[in-house]
Amino acid sequence: MRKNSVSRRTLLAGLGATGLLAACSGDDGARTLKVGSQKGGTKALMLSSGALEGIDYRVEWSEFPAAQNLLEALGSGAVDVGLAGDAPFQFAYQSGLPIKAVSAQRTDPRPSEAVVILVPEDSPIRSVADLRGKRIATTRGSIGYYLALRALHEAGLPPDAVTFTWLTPGDTRAAFASRTIDAWACWTPYSSTAIKEGARVIADGQNLIWGYVFEVAHEQAIARKKAVLADFLRREAKALEWAASHAPDYARTLAGETGLPIDIALTMVRKNSRRAVPIDQRLIDDERVVLDTFRAAGEIKPNRPLSEAFANILQR
């Protein structure tokens, strides 16, 4: 084991004081934190690392196929908190949902094949410029959609140079296999599975997306469950440190939770290696690019200040 790695025992020891503080918070009522997990990712991380051992509150897990579904559940109050990429979060926040980002993480190294635009192996499409007049499938407001908009812009193409088809990841996979679409803007594990099956990458997120993901919480959860929520976030940050040197362990749990093949789960873990980062002015400035991209595409009309999208409960 590398000297700078975080063992499960060290992780739990470091979290002991946090759990004790939560226990002494004065909240004697039954406490339940409803956590949304995309394709099992957050749940597998917390279970494999042992980060939730010793908590004095209950965690209820709900699984979602994509960020949009998770954010809709957050907006309705069906879950208290869940992890989502910066693009879908901004899309949802500007739609008026009562949610805020309460902690930030960043893919490390900066994302490449974690978010991609794919074409069939034998497609004549060789570059983003070749997408003019073609059909791209993705989920509206997703990180895949954001990558497509950025890639089109870099290639000198406006958004209406292509036809976007809005599909769930599962439906898109079927459409991609049947060739009813020309390209697919997607993310892991869907991208990893498609690449394994022969899909070809024509664009990735390198230098086009920031790689930020946020734990997003309902405003009522922030107000009523702040101590529990903050404890969960601190434990998650420690779990990310653990995962950086325990990818195979994390992947095994992820495969068990989701049914993904172990090689796909390991690829997903390695391509989405993340670290906790502060919600600071640099991050907010970076996020203005995301907001401006969606605005330029006519997708959103920002009516909420970006600075108010964040509730930095860990730094208060």
Q: Language-model features: where?
A:
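Short acidic capping loops at alpha-helix termini that bridge into adjacent secondary structure
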Residues: 127, 159-163, 263
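Conserved C-terminal helix/tail region of periplasmic/extracytoplasmic solute-binding proteins
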Residues: 294-316
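Short helix-loop capping/hinge motifs at secondary-structure junctions, enriched
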Residues: 121-128, 157-158, 220-229
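Secondary-structure end/capping motifs
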Residues: 41, 224-299
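N-terminal export signals
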Residues: 3-4, 10-25
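Solvent-exposed, polar/charged alpha-helical surfaces in well-ordered, non-transmembrane soluble domains
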Residues: 72, 76, 90, 129, ...
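Short, glycine-/small- and polar/acidic-enriched structural segments
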Residues: 29-155, 182, 207
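Pocket-lining segment of extracytoplasmic ligand-binding domains
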Residues: 87, 165-255
